[in-house]
Amino acid sequence: MSTKQHSAKDELLYLNKAVVFGSGAFGTALAMVLSKKCREVCVWHMNEEEVRLVNEKRENVLFLKGVQLASNITFTSDVEKAYNGAEIILFVIPTQFLRGFFEKSGGNLIAYAKEKQVPVLVCTKGIERSTLKFPAEIIGEFLPSPLLSVLAGPSFAIEVATGVFTCVSIASADINVARRLQRIMSTGDRSFVCWATTDTVGCEVASAVKNVLAIGSGVANGLGMGLNARAALIMRGLLEIRDLTAALGGDGSAVFGLAGLGDLQLTCSSELSRNFTVGKKLGKGLPIEEIQRTSKAVAEGVATADPLMRLAKQLKVKMPLCHQIYEIVYKKKNPRDALADLLSCGLQDEGLPPLFKRSASTPSKL
């Protein structure tokens, strides 16, 4: 028998009801996580006929085929029915549709969240085209910032939904808020484990930029480049995430954590990633219009590349990798030419600060 002592902060929290706004693959996967922690989980989807189909088949045949929904998960197209009684609210609506949702349907929901002080977990990734804002910033226009936290990290929907071991970060400006949500979202079987952080900016930047970089990784794969090139892209891309995070005032602690390096490595390395798949097709010569026309799922990196470049320009942050990916997606630049331009940048210092201080009296042994 284990003799390990558990403090109060280690004890998991269980709720009566949770609501997930956003019925895509990831929203459904998070509903499956919450089904282990709540008596009732409600998932909002705007199309009433599709809601009926999902509830009848007990499977999200639209976005997550093959995963049987837990018995305590219900889909609904009624916003008020969805949130009524909820003790936690998750937003997984695509970034470009978030503002429209609040403006059209958010009135009573906003009042409910404020009155009940319901914690809101932002799980959407990207940058809004019209304002260059991240998802938590958009929602922060409608709900008080102290209610908002961010979930980010390496988490393919199919693995989350089927209980394959997953670790993510939950970020809040108040570490105690993050720790409470950590106890709500982490499951008793430890298949879904959350780590708390205060770097909300780093989590949102990393979550958005990694999707653009994953397109680049896919392009390199489509061009027949190897794993060495992928590793270089991941590392240099991580520094672009670091620089943008710094420019936006983040403390950077999330950049080399689960939300940063962890999610970037995953998204850039697997065809389970929609963004990687889009990039691979671009690398093989398919036009972006055809790729998007034949794909049901949203590849957030495509929508993010343009506002990302405008934001970087505004902040005077150099992001050469992301710039070339933008050129491929939006300017129809030949992927091989984009690669050649990257390689012609000349020899440079690596640009990483030392991690350890060494006194002059202690010379290196190497």
Curated annotation (Swiss-Prot):
Gene Ontology BP, a term: glycerol-3-phosphate catabolic process
Superkingdom field: Eukaryota
Keyword annotations: Glycosome, NAD, Oxidoreductase, Peroxisome
UniProt keyword annotation of NAD present: yes
Annotated binding of substrate, by residue: 125, 274-275
Catalysed reaction, written as an equation: sn-glycerol 3-phosphate + NAD(+) = dihydroxyacetone phosphate + NADH + H(+)
Motif (Microbody targeting signal) on chain: 364-366
Enzyme class: oxidoreductase
Binding site for NAD(+): 22-27, 97, 125, 157, 274, 298, 300
EC number: 1.1.1.8
Active site positions, chain numbering: 210 (proton acceptor)
TM regions (residue ranges): none
Protein location: Glycosome
Record GO terms (molecular function): glycerol-3-phosphate dehydrogenase (NAD+) activity; NAD binding
Main location, first listed in the record: other
InterPro entries on file: 6-PGluconate_DH-like_C_sf (IPR008927), 6PGD_dom2 (IPR013328), G3P_DH_NAD-dep (IPR006168), G3P_DH_NAD-dep_C (IPR006109), G3P_DH_NAD-dep_N (IPR011128), NAD(P)-bd_dom_sf (IPR036291)
tRNA-binding among keywords: no
Family: Belongs to the NAD-dependent glycerol-3-phosphate dehydrogenase family.
HAMAP family for this protein: NAD_Glyc3P_dehydrog
The protein's name in its UniProt record: Glycerol-3-phosphate dehydrogenase [NAD(+)], glycosomal
